[in-house]
Amino acid sequence: MKLIRQLAAAVMFTALVIPVSATAQTDVDALRKQFNGIIEDLNDNSFERFNRAISKKDMTARIYGASVIEPEVKSAFSKEFSSSIQGLFTASFPKSKKEILGTVVDFRFKGNEGRAVVRYVSSGYRYSYHVYELGLDSKRRIQIADWIDYYRSSRFSEKVAQDLAMAMPGKQATRNLLRRQSYNEGQIFQVGELFKAVRDNQPERFFQIFDGLDEVLLKEPLLLRINLQFAMAFPQSPRAGNAVRLLVESFPNEALYSLQMTEYYIQTGQFQEAIEALTTLEAGLGIRDGAIGSLKSSAALAMGRTEDAVAYALQATVAEPTLQVSWWSLLRARTRAEDYSGATEALARLEDDFGHSMDPATLRRDRFLRVLASNPVYQDWRASRQ
């Protein structure tokens, strides 16, 4: 009888627990679908749902609490909150010759708090990653509290607060933007003039002042970040290299700066450093990302490390089997490694899943793939698909 009661209790426990777990997952799936819809609207050039999802009360509290902002600046921003947020959001991306599109690559929710990672892609395989802090309103609609922008190396609310403070950089506002509060009046004046150059978008004036800053100020993360952003307009210059050096020395292995570091390293042919920065970025995001794996594969190929290139490309296809660039990376890596049988796997996925025609004429137009066109393994594969 005791055994029967135990079995009955176990059955009752299972009956109670499984539906709750299933319901919780169903709820997360519904929330993800809701958030996907917000990003899809952005992709369709509509900012309305994204703007509605932002918790204005929480966002303004974060912005106004992060810095000393002059009352007239604060008033003007509050009156134009929605349009200001939209302008600042769209200005945060790298320049692109084509439409910038976002993809939700990670979504998690527990209770009333969640987190989503969105990858935005620009032309030239340039990426931006946002990590959104999410909540729910009383009707269980997604609310966006804030986000970390890895391309701009900052939290959105903090960046807005800094921009607003720099609009009228008085002594207290200037001091408040710095991590250390014990600078003397002369040093605060230097930084205030620097912020005016940022506000007026005067890079030459900015560099002139930055080069004369007291040594102690060159540990301030905000100043180093702005210096890198201005210097990246001239990536081949010694100034850009020095800006990167200052950041790396002051904040080694800091994920927040890793994406901008990656761009610099790729543009200057420092491919091993690019791979290391991308690894730091993935660790910061807390995910395996197909686009990052593809970039690692390309960097490894540029160094002639075909085995590593194949490994990174495979990681990309496992992380995101529906991401087209992952399969292109695997195709190029296996072709370079002369693994032609393996290359046909990627060819098949590109044809079957993404609608490409991988015929000989197509391959010959690609300098990395033209060797395949006359290869017997490829020709047998091509014949088998006729």
Q: Where are these predicted regions, by residue range?
A:
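Short, low-complexity N-terminal intrinsically disordered segments enriched in polar/charged residues
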Residues: 22-46, 175-190
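Generic helix N-cap/helix-start motif at coil->alpha-helix transitions
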Residues: 29-31, 111-113, 124-126, 182-191, ...
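Long, contiguous interaction/recruitment modules in multidomain scaffold/adaptor proteins
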Residues: 68-195, 199-217, 238-241, 246
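TPR-repeat structural position
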Residues: 203-204, 237-238, 271, 306, ...
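A conserved position within tetratricopeptide repeats
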Residues: 211-215, 245-249, 282-283, 317-318, ...
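Alpha-helical adaptor scaffolds
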Residues: 225-233, 245, 255-272, 276-319, ...
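Terminal, low-structured helical/coil segments at or just beyond the last alpha-helical repeat
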Residues: 356-386
